[in-house]
Protein backbone atom coordinates (compact mmCIF):
# COMPACT_ATOMS: atom_id res chain seq x y z
CA UNK A 1 0.00 0.00 0.00
CA UNK A 2 3.01 2.33 -0.15
CA UNK A 3 1.67 3.79 -3.40
CA UNK A 4 -1.37 5.02 -1.51
CA UNK A 5 0.84 6.58 1.15
CA UNK A 6 2.92 8.21 -1.59
CA UNK A 7 -0.20 9.86 -3.01
CA UNK A 8 -0.97 11.50 0.34
CA UNK A 9 2.63 12.66 0.75
CA UNK A 10 2.42 14.22 -2.71
CA UNK A 11 -0.88 15.88 -1.75
CA UNK A 12 0.66 17.37 1.40
CA UNK A 13 3.63 18.73 -0.51
CA UNK A 14 1.38 20.35 -3.12
CA UNK A 15 -0.59 22.05 -0.34
CA UNK A 16 2.53 23.53 1.26
CA UNK A 17 4.54 24.78 -1.71
CA UNK A 18 4.62 28.31 -0.27
CA UNK A 19 5.80 27.32 3.19
CA UNK A 20 8.99 29.34 3.92
CA UNK A 21 12.28 27.50 4.19
CA UNK A 22 13.60 29.98 6.75
CA UNK A 23 12.56 30.33 10.39
CA UNK A 24 12.82 33.80 11.85
CA UNK A 25 12.67 35.10 15.41
CA UNK A 26 15.45 37.03 17.12
CA UNK A 27 17.69 35.03 14.79
CA UNK A 28 17.23 33.43 11.37
CA UNK A 29 17.93 29.85 10.32
CA UNK A 30 17.45 28.12 6.98
CA UNK A 31 16.13 24.60 7.29
CA UNK A 32 17.82 21.65 5.63
CA UNK A 33 15.86 20.09 2.78
CA UNK A 34 14.99 17.01 4.88
CA UNK A 35 13.74 19.20 7.75
CA UNK A 36 11.55 21.27 5.45
CA UNK A 37 10.22 18.12 3.75
CA UNK A 38 8.96 16.43 6.91
CA UNK A 39 7.45 19.66 8.24
CA UNK A 40 5.52 20.21 5.02
CA UNK A 41 4.13 16.67 5.02
CA UNK A 42 3.09 16.72 8.69
CA UNK A 43 1.44 20.14 8.37
CA UNK A 44 0.07 19.49 4.88
CA UNK A 45 -1.88 16.44 6.09
CA UNK A 46 -4.05 17.78 8.88
CA UNK A 47 -5.34 14.27 9.63
CA UNK A 48 -1.79 12.95 10.10
CA UNK A 49 -2.15 12.98 13.84
CA UNK A 50 1.17 11.46 14.86
CA UNK A 51 4.69 11.03 13.60
CA UNK A 52 7.98 9.64 14.86
CA UNK A 53 11.10 11.63 14.05
CA UNK A 54 13.65 8.83 13.92
CA UNK A 55 16.59 11.14 13.31
CA UNK A 56 20.11 10.34 14.40
CA UNK A 57 21.81 12.65 16.87
CA UNK A 58 22.96 15.98 15.58
CA UNK A 59 20.77 16.41 12.49
CA UNK A 60 18.30 18.86 14.03
CA UNK A 61 15.23 17.07 15.44
CA UNK A 62 14.58 19.94 17.83
CA UNK A 63 14.85 22.56 15.09
CA UNK A 64 12.48 20.62 12.83
CA UNK A 65 9.94 20.32 15.63
CA UNK A 66 10.10 24.00 16.58
CA UNK A 67 9.51 24.91 12.92
CA UNK A 68 6.40 22.71 12.91
CA UNK A 69 5.15 24.29 16.14
CA UNK A 70 5.72 27.76 14.70
CA UNK A 71 3.48 26.94 11.73
CA UNK A 72 0.69 25.07 13.53
CA UNK A 73 -1.56 28.13 13.22
CA UNK A 74 -1.32 27.82 9.45
CA UNK A 75 -3.82 24.96 9.78
CA UNK A 76 -5.82 25.95 12.91
CA UNK A 77 -6.11 29.06 15.06
CA UNK A 78 -5.89 27.87 18.67
CA UNK A 79 -3.25 25.43 19.89
CA UNK A 80 -1.98 24.30 23.26
CA UNK A 81 1.51 22.82 23.03
CA UNK A 82 2.57 20.25 25.63
CA UNK A 83 6.24 19.30 25.64
CA UNK A 84 7.14 16.16 27.58
CA UNK A 85 10.89 16.29 28.11
CA UNK A 86 13.64 15.41 30.55
CA UNK A 87 14.29 18.17 33.05
CA UNK A 88 17.89 18.59 31.89
CA UNK A 89 16.73 19.40 28.34
CA UNK A 90 14.02 21.99 29.04
CA UNK A 91 16.31 25.03 29.02
CA UNK A 92 18.72 23.77 26.40
CA UNK A 93 17.90 22.89 23.70
CA UNK A 94 14.12 23.44 23.90
CA UNK A 95 13.56 26.87 25.47
CA UNK A 96 16.67 28.32 23.87
CA UNK A 97 15.60 27.18 20.39
CA UNK A 98 12.01 28.39 20.82
CA UNK A 99 13.07 31.81 22.15
CA UNK A 100 15.56 32.19 19.35
CA UNK A 101 13.39 31.21 16.39
CA UNK A 102 9.73 31.08 17.49
CA UNK A 103 9.26 33.32 20.56
CA UNK A 104 5.62 33.93 19.67
CA UNK A 105 4.66 30.35 20.65
CA UNK A 106 6.10 30.49 24.19
CA UNK A 107 2.73 31.57 25.61
CA UNK A 108 1.18 28.38 24.21
CA UNK A 109 3.87 26.02 25.56
CA UNK A 110 3.56 23.85 28.65
CA UNK A 111 6.72 21.99 29.68
CA UNK A 112 6.30 18.87 31.81
CA UNK A 113 9.22 16.77 33.01
CA UNK A 114 8.35 13.08 32.64
CA UNK A 115 11.10 12.21 35.14
CA UNK A 116 9.15 14.05 37.83
CA UNK A 117 7.60 11.85 40.54
CA UNK A 118 4.39 13.87 40.16
CA UNK A 119 4.41 13.71 36.36
CA UNK A 120 1.02 12.02 36.09
CA UNK A 121 -0.75 14.57 38.29
CA UNK A 122 0.93 17.54 36.62
CA UNK A 123 0.03 16.23 33.17
CA UNK A 124 -3.67 15.75 33.85
CA UNK A 125 -3.89 19.00 35.82
CA UNK A 126 -2.58 20.87 32.79
CA UNK A 127 -4.90 18.99 30.45
CA UNK A 128 -7.88 20.22 32.48
CA UNK A 129 -6.79 23.86 32.10
CA UNK A 130 -6.73 23.77 28.29
CA UNK A 131 -9.58 25.54 26.52
CA UNK A 132 -11.98 23.05 24.95
CA UNK A 133 -11.80 24.96 21.66
CA UNK A 134 -8.03 24.50 21.45
CA UNK A 135 -6.37 21.64 19.68
CA UNK A 136 -3.39 20.06 21.42
CA UNK A 137 0.02 19.28 19.99
CA UNK A 138 2.06 16.94 22.18
CA UNK A 139 5.82 16.66 21.79
CA UNK A 140 7.58 13.69 23.42
CA UNK A 141 11.33 14.23 23.36
CA UNK A 142 13.58 11.17 23.71
CA UNK A 143 10.39 9.14 23.44
CA UNK A 144 12.21 5.86 24.11
CA UNK A 145 12.54 7.02 27.73
CA UNK A 146 8.82 7.78 27.92
CA UNK A 147 7.99 4.37 26.44
CA UNK A 148 10.35 2.62 28.84
CA UNK A 149 8.68 4.35 31.79
CA UNK A 150 5.27 3.21 30.50
CA UNK A 151 6.06 -0.49 30.35
CA UNK A 152 4.37 -2.69 32.92
CA UNK A 153 6.93 -4.04 35.39
CA UNK A 154 7.67 -7.73 35.72
CA UNK A 155 5.75 -7.80 38.99
CA UNK A 156 2.64 -6.61 37.15
CA UNK A 157 2.61 -3.14 38.70
CA UNK A 158 1.45 -0.39 36.36
CA UNK A 159 3.78 2.61 36.37
CA UNK A 160 2.35 6.15 36.72
CA UNK A 161 3.51 7.14 33.24
CA UNK A 162 1.31 4.41 31.73
CA UNK A 163 -1.88 6.38 32.37
CA UNK A 164 -0.49 9.28 30.32
CA UNK A 165 0.50 6.83 27.57
CA UNK A 166 -3.03 5.39 27.54
CA UNK A 167 -4.58 8.87 27.43
CA UNK A 168 -2.45 9.95 24.48
CA UNK A 169 -3.02 6.76 22.48
CA UNK A 170 -6.80 7.12 22.89
CA UNK A 171 -7.17 10.88 22.60
CA UNK A 172 -4.78 12.26 19.99
CA UNK A 173 -6.51 10.87 16.90
CA UNK A 174 -10.00 10.82 18.41
CA UNK A 175 -9.96 14.55 19.24
CA UNK A 176 -8.09 15.62 16.08
CA UNK A 177 -4.95 16.59 18.00
CA UNK A 178 -1.34 16.10 16.88
CA UNK A 179 1.70 14.40 18.39
CA UNK A 180 5.39 14.20 17.48
CA UNK A 181 7.74 11.68 19.08
CA UNK A 182 11.49 12.28 18.82
CA UNK A 183 14.29 9.77 19.22
CA UNK A 184 17.60 8.78 17.71
CA UNK A 185 17.15 5.34 19.30
CA UNK A 186 13.43 4.44 19.35
CA UNK A 187 14.10 0.88 20.53
CA UNK A 188 16.53 0.45 23.40
CA UNK A 189 16.01 -2.65 25.52
CA UNK A 190 13.29 -4.89 24.14
CA UNK A 191 11.05 -5.66 21.16
CA UNK A 192 8.08 -4.73 23.35
CA UNK A 193 9.15 -1.11 23.06
CA UNK A 194 8.51 -1.30 19.29
CA UNK A 195 4.97 -2.56 19.91
CA UNK A 196 4.35 0.15 22.51
CA UNK A 197 5.61 2.90 20.22
CA UNK A 198 3.61 1.70 17.22
CA UNK A 199 0.42 1.55 19.29
CA UNK A 200 1.06 5.05 20.62
CA UNK A 201 1.39 6.40 17.08
CA UNK A 202 -1.22 4.12 15.48
CA UNK A 203 -3.56 3.06 18.34
CA UNK A 204 -4.66 -0.56 18.24
CA UNK A 205 -2.87 -1.38 14.99
CA UNK A 206 -0.48 -3.91 16.51
CA UNK A 207 -2.20 -6.25 18.95
CA UNK A 208 -0.45 -8.71 21.23
CA UNK A 209 1.27 -10.81 18.59
CA UNK A 210 4.68 -12.38 18.38
CA UNK A 211 6.82 -10.32 16.03
CA UNK A 212 9.67 -12.82 15.78
CA UNK A 213 10.17 -16.49 15.20
CA UNK A 214 13.71 -17.78 15.66
CA UNK A 215 14.91 -14.15 15.76
CA UNK A 216 13.36 -13.44 12.33
CA UNK A 217 10.45 -11.07 11.74
CA UNK A 218 7.34 -13.12 11.09
CA UNK A 219 6.02 -10.86 8.32
CA UNK A 220 8.06 -7.78 7.51
CA UNK A 221 5.98 -7.02 4.40
CA UNK A 222 2.78 -6.86 6.45
CA UNK A 223 4.36 -4.41 8.89
CA UNK A 224 5.71 -2.19 6.12
CA UNK A 225 2.41 -2.26 4.24
CA UNK A 226 0.27 -1.26 7.21
CA UNK A 227 2.67 1.22 8.85
CA UNK A 228 3.45 3.43 5.87
CA UNK A 229 4.11 7.05 6.85
CA UNK A 230 4.75 6.10 10.48
CA UNK A 231 7.97 8.06 10.74
CA UNK A 232 10.57 10.33 9.26
CA UNK A 233 13.87 8.47 8.99
CA UNK A 234 17.12 10.42 8.85
CA UNK A 235 19.92 8.02 9.76
CA UNK A 236 23.12 8.61 7.84
CA UNK A 237 25.06 6.10 9.90
CA UNK A 238 23.27 2.75 9.77
CA UNK A 239 26.37 0.83 10.80
CA UNK A 240 26.75 -0.87 14.14
CA UNK A 241 28.25 1.31 16.84
CA UNK A 242 31.20 -1.10 16.77
CA UNK A 243 31.94 -0.48 13.07
CA UNK A 244 34.29 2.11 11.62
CA UNK A 245 32.65 4.82 9.51
CA UNK A 246 34.39 7.01 6.97
CA UNK A 247 34.04 10.75 7.33
CA UNK A 248 32.14 13.10 5.03
CA UNK A 249 31.84 16.81 4.42
CA UNK A 250 29.44 17.10 7.36
CA UNK A 251 30.45 14.27 9.71
CA UNK A 252 33.74 13.30 11.33
CA UNK A 253 35.35 9.93 10.66
CA UNK A 254 34.72 7.31 13.36
CA UNK A 255 37.28 4.66 14.31
CA UNK A 256 36.49 2.08 16.98
CA UNK A 257 39.26 0.74 19.20
CA UNK A 258 38.82 -2.10 21.69
CA UNK A 259 41.31 -1.55 24.52
CA UNK A 260 41.65 -4.74 26.56
CA UNK A 261 43.33 -4.20 29.92
CA UNK A 262 44.33 -6.91 32.38
CA UNK A 263 43.12 -6.33 35.92
CA UNK A 264 45.72 -6.16 38.67
CA UNK A 265 45.87 -8.96 41.24
CA UNK A 266 44.20 -6.67 43.75
CA UNK A 267 41.36 -5.92 41.32
CA UNK A 268 40.89 -9.61 40.50
CA UNK A 269 40.66 -10.42 44.20
CA UNK A 270 38.01 -7.75 44.79
CA UNK A 271 36.21 -8.70 41.56
CA UNK A 272 35.73 -12.28 42.77
CA UNK A 273 34.43 -11.02 46.14
CA UNK A 274 32.01 -8.75 44.29
CA UNK A 275 30.79 -11.70 42.25
CA UNK A 276 30.08 -13.74 45.40
CA UNK A 277 28.33 -10.77 47.02
CA UNK A 278 26.03 -10.44 44.00
CA UNK A 279 25.08 -14.11 44.24
CA UNK A 280 24.39 -13.86 47.98
CA UNK A 281 22.20 -10.79 47.65
CA UNK A 282 20.41 -11.97 44.50
CA UNK A 283 21.51 -9.07 42.31
CA UNK A 284 23.90 -10.96 40.04
CA UNK A 285 21.70 -10.29 37.01
CA UNK A 286 22.45 -6.57 37.31
CA UNK A 287 26.23 -7.13 37.64
CA UNK A 288 26.60 -3.76 39.41
CA UNK A 289 29.25 -4.79 41.94
CA UNK A 290 31.39 -6.52 39.32
CA UNK A 291 31.07 -3.55 36.97
CA UNK A 292 32.32 -1.25 39.71
CA UNK A 293 35.14 -3.66 40.58
CA UNK A 294 36.45 -3.68 37.01
CA UNK A 295 36.60 0.10 37.20
CA UNK A 296 38.21 0.76 40.59
CA UNK A 297 38.86 -1.12 43.81
CA UNK A 298 39.70 0.09 47.29
CA UNK A 299 42.11 -1.88 49.48
CA UNK A 300 39.18 -3.93 50.79
CA UNK A 301 35.70 -4.92 49.62
CA UNK A 302 32.99 -3.38 51.83
CA UNK A 303 30.19 -5.90 52.40
CA UNK A 304 26.73 -4.34 52.30
CA UNK A 305 24.46 -7.25 53.16
CA UNK A 306 22.87 -7.24 56.62
CA UNK A 307 24.50 -3.94 57.56
CA UNK A 308 23.15 -0.62 58.69
CA UNK A 309 23.10 1.74 55.65
CA UNK A 310 24.75 4.50 57.65
CA UNK A 311 27.54 2.20 58.78
CA UNK A 312 28.13 1.04 55.21
CA UNK A 313 28.19 4.61 53.89
CA UNK A 314 30.68 5.57 56.61
CA UNK A 315 33.01 2.74 55.58
CA UNK A 316 32.87 3.87 51.93
CA UNK A 317 33.59 7.45 52.98
CA UNK A 318 36.56 6.30 55.07
CA UNK A 319 38.01 4.26 52.21
CA UNK A 320 37.59 7.20 49.84
CA UNK A 321 39.23 9.66 52.22
CA UNK A 322 42.11 7.26 52.87
CA UNK A 323 42.74 6.99 49.14
CA UNK A 324 42.40 10.74 48.63
CA UNK A 325 44.82 11.44 51.47
CA UNK A 326 47.31 8.97 50.02
CA UNK A 327 47.53 11.22 46.94
CA UNK A 328 47.87 14.49 48.81
CA UNK A 329 50.70 16.63 47.42
CA UNK A 330 51.59 13.90 44.90
CA UNK A 331 51.64 14.30 41.14
CA UNK A 332 53.67 13.09 38.20
CA UNK A 333 56.79 15.01 37.25
CA UNK A 334 56.94 17.03 34.03
CA UNK A 335 59.31 14.43 32.63
CA UNK A 336 56.80 11.64 33.29
CA UNK A 337 53.92 13.62 31.78
CA UNK A 338 55.98 14.36 28.66
CA UNK A 339 56.63 10.63 28.35
CA UNK A 340 52.90 9.86 28.63
CA UNK A 341 52.05 12.52 26.04
CA UNK A 342 54.35 10.76 23.57
CA UNK A 343 52.29 7.61 24.08
CA UNK A 344 55.07 5.89 26.02
CA UNK A 345 55.26 4.25 29.45
CA UNK A 346 57.80 5.05 32.15
CA UNK A 347 61.24 3.61 31.49
CA UNK A 348 64.07 2.53 33.74
CA UNK A 349 65.35 6.08 33.95
CA UNK A 350 62.12 7.39 35.50
CA UNK A 351 62.20 8.67 39.06
CA UNK A 352 61.33 6.33 41.92
CA UNK A 353 58.49 8.67 42.95
CA UNK A 354 56.89 8.50 39.48
CA UNK A 355 57.21 4.71 39.27
CA UNK A 356 55.80 4.24 42.78
CA UNK A 357 52.82 6.52 42.09
CA UNK A 358 52.06 4.83 38.77
CA UNK A 359 52.22 1.36 40.36
CA UNK A 360 49.89 2.32 43.22
CA UNK A 361 47.32 3.85 40.89
CA UNK A 362 47.42 0.94 38.46
CA UNK A 363 46.90 -1.61 41.23
CA UNK A 364 43.55 -0.01 42.05
CA UNK A 365 42.36 0.71 38.50
CA UNK A 366 43.91 -0.37 35.23
CA UNK A 367 40.98 1.28 33.45
CA UNK A 368 41.57 4.72 34.98
CA UNK A 369 45.29 4.46 34.23
CA UNK A 370 44.54 3.52 30.62
CA UNK A 371 42.12 6.43 30.22
CA UNK A 372 44.57 8.97 31.64
CA UNK A 373 47.34 7.74 29.35
CA UNK A 374 44.98 7.87 26.38
CA UNK A 375 43.88 11.42 27.17
CA UNK A 376 47.43 12.72 27.51
CA UNK A 377 48.40 11.12 24.19
CA UNK A 378 45.34 12.50 22.40
CA UNK A 379 45.86 15.34 19.93
CA UNK A 380 42.60 17.07 20.87
CA UNK A 381 39.70 17.18 23.28
CA UNK A 382 38.33 14.05 24.94
CA UNK A 383 35.12 12.68 26.42
CA UNK A 384 35.00 10.02 29.11
CA UNK A 385 31.81 8.08 29.84
CA UNK A 386 31.61 6.73 33.39
CA UNK A 387 28.08 5.80 34.54
CA UNK A 388 28.95 5.54 38.23
CA UNK A 389 29.31 8.87 39.98
CA UNK A 390 30.23 8.01 43.56
CA UNK A 391 32.14 5.17 45.26
CA UNK A 392 34.23 3.85 42.34
CA UNK A 393 33.19 6.20 39.57
CA UNK A 394 33.65 9.83 38.60
CA UNK A 395 34.52 10.92 42.14
CA UNK A 396 37.61 8.68 42.07
CA UNK A 397 38.43 9.33 38.41
CA UNK A 398 38.79 13.05 39.10
CA UNK A 399 41.50 12.23 41.66
CA UNK A 400 43.39 10.42 38.89
CA UNK A 401 42.92 13.41 36.59
CA UNK A 402 44.43 15.69 39.24
CA UNK A 403 47.52 13.52 39.62
CA UNK A 404 47.95 13.30 35.83
CA UNK A 405 47.42 17.06 35.40
CA UNK A 406 44.33 16.66 33.17
CA UNK A 407 42.04 19.71 33.07
CA UNK A 408 38.39 18.71 33.05
CA UNK A 409 34.72 19.46 33.54
CA UNK A 410 32.06 17.11 34.91
CA UNK A 411 28.54 16.57 33.54
CA UNK A 412 26.64 14.43 36.04
CA UNK A 413 23.91 14.50 38.67
CA UNK A 414 26.42 16.19 41.02
CA UNK A 415 26.82 19.22 38.75
CA UNK A 416 23.21 20.08 37.82
CA UNK A 417 23.66 23.78 38.61
CA UNK A 418 26.89 24.30 36.69
CA UNK A 419 27.10 21.66 33.95
CA UNK A 420 25.35 23.57 31.13
CA UNK A 421 27.68 26.55 31.57
CA UNK A 422 30.67 24.22 31.83
CA UNK A 423 29.81 22.50 28.54
CA UNK A 424 29.45 25.90 26.86
CA UNK A 425 32.98 26.80 28.00
CA UNK A 426 34.26 23.39 26.88
CA UNK A 427 32.73 23.96 23.42
CA UNK A 428 34.09 27.48 22.94
CA UNK A 429 36.08 28.09 19.77
CA UNK A 430 39.05 29.17 21.89
CA UNK A 431 39.08 25.63 23.35
CA UNK A 432 38.89 23.80 20.01
CA UNK A 433 42.15 21.99 20.68
CA UNK A 434 41.59 21.52 24.41
CA UNK A 435 44.10 24.15 25.47
CA UNK A 436 41.91 25.37 28.34
CA UNK A 437 39.82 22.28 29.15
CA UNK A 438 41.10 18.96 27.89
CA UNK A 439 38.35 16.56 28.96
CA UNK A 440 34.70 16.26 29.87
CA UNK A 441 33.75 13.28 32.00
CA UNK A 442 30.04 12.50 31.95
CA UNK A 443 27.59 10.02 33.40
CA UNK A 444 24.30 8.81 31.95
CA UNK A 445 23.02 12.36 32.52
CA UNK A 446 25.06 13.42 29.51
CA UNK A 447 23.96 10.60 27.23
CA UNK A 448 21.16 12.58 25.63
CA UNK A 449 20.36 16.07 24.46
CA UNK A 450 23.76 17.75 24.68
CA UNK A 451 26.35 18.37 21.99
CA UNK A 452 30.13 18.44 22.11
CA UNK A 453 32.30 19.99 19.41
CA UNK A 454 35.77 19.12 18.08
CA UNK A 455 36.13 15.91 20.09
CA UNK A 456 38.92 13.57 18.97
CA UNK A 457 38.70 10.73 21.49
CA UNK A 458 35.86 9.14 23.47
CA UNK A 459 36.67 6.66 26.23
CA UNK A 460 33.86 4.36 27.35
CA UNK A 461 34.70 2.87 30.73
CA UNK A 462 31.61 0.76 31.24
CA UNK A 463 29.43 -1.14 28.78
CA UNK A 464 25.75 -0.22 28.74
CA UNK A 465 22.99 -2.82 28.41
CA UNK A 466 22.19 -1.96 24.81
CA UNK A 467 23.68 -0.58 21.63
CA UNK A 468 21.17 2.28 21.54
CA UNK A 469 22.65 3.83 24.68
CA UNK A 470 26.15 3.51 23.26
CA UNK A 471 24.95 5.15 20.05
CA UNK A 472 23.56 8.05 22.08
CA UNK A 473 26.86 8.41 23.92
CA UNK A 474 28.98 8.44 20.77
CA UNK A 475 26.42 10.66 19.07
CA UNK A 476 27.23 13.43 21.54
CA UNK A 477 30.53 13.95 19.70
CA UNK A 478 29.80 12.98 16.09
CA UNK A 479 27.13 15.39 14.94
CA UNK A 480 26.31 17.40 11.88
CA UNK A 481 29.19 19.91 11.44
CA UNK A 482 30.52 19.16 14.94
CA UNK A 483 34.10 19.35 13.64
CA UNK A 484 33.78 22.34 11.33
CA UNK A 485 36.26 24.35 13.46
CA UNK A 486 38.72 21.47 13.76
CA UNK A 487 41.75 21.35 11.43
CA UNK A 488 41.06 18.95 8.49
CA UNK A 489 43.65 16.43 9.67
CA UNK A 490 41.82 16.14 13.00
CA UNK A 491 38.25 15.68 11.80
CA UNK A 492 38.00 12.26 13.34
CA UNK A 493 36.73 10.62 16.52
CA UNK A 494 38.39 7.57 18.03
CA UNK A 495 35.94 5.58 20.16
CA UNK A 496 37.79 3.56 22.80
CA UNK A 497 35.91 0.73 24.53
CA UNK A 498 37.96 -0.17 27.60
CA UNK A 499 37.37 -3.82 28.49
CA UNK A 500 38.76 -5.45 31.63
CA UNK A 501 40.13 -8.99 31.48
CA UNK A 502 40.94 -11.71 34.01
CA UNK A 503 44.29 -13.49 34.04
CA UNK A 504 42.61 -16.93 33.83
CA UNK A 505 40.89 -16.04 30.56
CA UNK A 506 37.35 -16.32 31.96
CA UNK A 507 34.96 -13.70 30.54
CA UNK A 508 34.46 -10.57 32.63
CA UNK A 509 31.29 -8.57 33.08
CA UNK A 510 32.48 -6.24 30.29
CA UNK A 511 32.65 -9.13 27.85
CA UNK A 512 29.28 -10.47 29.06
CA UNK A 513 27.59 -7.15 28.35
CA UNK A 514 29.25 -6.97 24.94
CA UNK A 515 27.67 -10.34 24.05
CA UNK A 516 24.26 -9.18 25.30
CA UNK A 517 24.44 -6.11 23.08
CA UNK A 518 25.38 -8.20 20.05
CA UNK A 519 22.46 -10.59 20.66
CA UNK A 520 19.86 -7.82 21.01
CA UNK A 521 21.00 -6.04 17.87
CA UNK A 522 19.95 -8.93 15.59
CA UNK A 523 16.26 -8.26 16.20
CA UNK A 524 16.58 -4.49 16.46
CA UNK A 525 18.24 -4.23 13.04
CA UNK A 526 15.18 -5.84 11.45
CA UNK A 527 12.81 -3.44 13.23
CA UNK A 528 14.92 -0.46 12.22
CA UNK A 529 14.55 -1.66 8.63
CA UNK A 530 10.77 -1.53 9.10
CA UNK A 531 11.07 2.07 10.30
CA UNK A 532 13.18 2.92 7.26
CA UNK A 533 10.80 1.37 4.73
CA UNK A 534 7.73 2.98 6.32
CA UNK A 535 9.30 6.43 6.44
CA UNK A 536 8.05 9.44 4.53
CA UNK A 537 11.45 9.80 2.87
CA UNK A 538 11.64 6.19 1.64
CA UNK A 539 8.09 6.18 0.27
CA UNK A 540 8.51 9.54 -1.45
CA UNK A 541 11.80 8.48 -3.06
CA UNK A 542 10.77 4.99 -4.16
CA UNK A 543 7.03 5.09 -4.94
CA UNK A 544 6.39 7.11 -8.09
CA UNK A 545 3.56 5.16 -9.75
CA UNK A 546 0.47 6.56 -8.04
CA UNK A 547 -2.65 8.51 -8.94
CA UNK A 548 -2.72 12.04 -7.47
CA UNK A 549 -5.48 12.84 -4.97
CA UNK A 550 -7.17 16.13 -4.16
CA UNK A 551 -8.22 15.57 -0.53
CA UNK A 552 -7.14 13.62 2.55
CA UNK A 553 -10.44 11.95 3.38
CA UNK A 554 -9.02 8.43 3.05
CA UNK A 555 -5.89 8.91 5.18
CA UNK A 556 -7.48 7.86 8.48
CA UNK A 557 -8.78 4.63 6.97
CA UNK A 558 -5.41 3.91 5.37
CA UNK A 559 -3.46 4.21 8.62
CA UNK A 560 -6.05 2.53 10.87
CA UNK A 561 -5.81 -0.95 9.36
CA UNK A 562 -4.94 -3.66 11.86
CA UNK A 563 -1.74 -5.63 11.39
CA UNK A 564 -2.18 -9.39 11.10
CA UNK A 565 0.89 -11.47 11.90
CA UNK A 566 -1.06 -14.62 12.77
CA UNK A 567 -0.37 -16.30 9.43
CA UNK A 568 3.01 -17.68 8.48
CA UNK A 569 2.13 -17.47 4.82
CA UNK A 570 5.17 -15.37 4.04
CA UNK A 571 7.63 -17.65 5.82
CA UNK A 572 9.12 -20.36 3.66
CA UNK A 573 11.74 -22.85 4.71
CA UNK A 574 14.39 -23.63 2.15
CA UNK A 575 17.27 -26.07 2.22
CA UNK A 576 20.32 -24.32 0.83
CA UNK A 577 23.60 -25.96 -0.08
CA UNK A 578 26.80 -24.26 0.90
CA UNK A 579 29.47 -24.02 3.56
CA UNK A 580 29.78 -22.70 7.10
CA UNK A 581 31.96 -19.62 7.44
CA UNK A 582 33.21 -17.14 10.02
CA UNK A 583 32.74 -13.42 9.41
CA UNK A 584 33.28 -10.07 11.11
CA UNK A 585 32.07 -6.54 10.45
CA UNK A 586 35.29 -5.04 11.76
CA UNK A 587 38.80 -5.03 10.35
CA UNK A 588 40.03 -5.40 13.93
CA UNK A 589 37.85 -8.50 14.46
CA UNK A 590 36.08 -7.02 17.48
CA UNK A 591 33.31 -9.58 17.07
CA UNK A 592 33.52 -12.83 15.10
CA UNK A 593 30.29 -14.51 14.04
CA UNK A 594 29.24 -17.83 12.58
CA UNK A 595 27.62 -17.64 9.17
CA UNK A 596 26.72 -19.62 6.08
CA UNK A 597 27.63 -19.06 2.42
CA UNK A 598 25.29 -20.60 -0.13
CA UNK A 599 26.52 -21.98 -3.46
CA UNK A 600 24.87 -18.94 -5.07
CA UNK A 601 27.19 -16.63 -3.11
CA UNK A 602 24.54 -15.33 -0.72
CA UNK A 603 25.70 -14.98 2.90
CA UNK A 604 23.43 -15.67 5.90
CA UNK A 605 23.87 -15.30 9.64
CA UNK A 606 23.60 -18.24 12.03
CA UNK A 607 19.81 -17.77 12.29
CA UNK A 608 19.32 -17.91 8.54
CA UNK A 609 18.85 -14.19 7.97
CA UNK A 610 20.20 -13.03 4.59
CA UNK A 611 23.03 -10.54 5.04
CA UNK A 612 24.44 -9.77 1.58
CA UNK A 613 26.18 -11.32 -1.40
CA UNK A 614 29.77 -12.49 -1.10
CA UNK A 615 32.08 -9.91 -2.75
CA UNK A 616 34.03 -10.97 -5.84
CA UNK A 617 37.29 -10.33 -4.00
CA UNK A 618 36.50 -10.72 -0.30
CA UNK A 619 38.84 -9.53 2.43
CA UNK A 620 39.94 -12.50 4.53
CA UNK A 621 41.96 -12.57 7.74
CA UNK A 622 43.31 -15.48 9.76
CA UNK A 623 42.54 -15.51 13.49
CA UNK A 624 43.02 -18.44 15.89
CA UNK A 625 43.32 -20.80 12.95
CA UNK A 626 40.06 -19.60 11.38
CA UNK A 627 39.50 -17.87 8.04
CA UNK A 628 37.47 -14.75 8.84
CA UNK A 629 35.60 -12.90 6.06
CA UNK A 630 35.50 -9.14 6.60
CA UNK A 631 32.24 -7.52 5.42
Swiss-Prot record:
Effect upon mutating residue 141 to E: 50% loss of ATP hydrolysis
UniProt catalytic activity: a ribonucleoside 5'-triphosphate + H2O = a ribonucleoside 5'-diphosphate + phosphate + H(+)
Domain Helicase C-terminal: 367-532
Effect annotated for changing residue 145 to Q: No effect on ATP hydrolysis
GO biological process annotation, one example: DNA-templated transcription
PROSITE patterns cross-referenced by the UniProt entry: HELICASE_ATP_BIND_1, HELICASE_CTER
Subunit structure: Monomer. Interacts (via C-terminus) with RAP94/OPG109 (via N-terminus). Interacts with the cap-specific mRNA (nucleoside-2'-O-)-methyltransferase OPG102.
Purpose of the protein: DNA-dependent ATPase that acts as a 5' to 3' translocase on single-stranded DNA and thereby plays a role in transcription termination of viral early genes. Uses forward translocation in concert with the viral RNA polymerase RAP94/OPG109 subunit and the capping enzyme/VTF to catalyze release of UUUUUNU-containing nascent RNA from the elongation complex. In addition, acts as a positive elongation factor to assist transcription through problematic sequences.
Protein name: Nucleoside triphosphatase I
Originating species: Vaccinia virus (strain Western Reserve) (VACV)
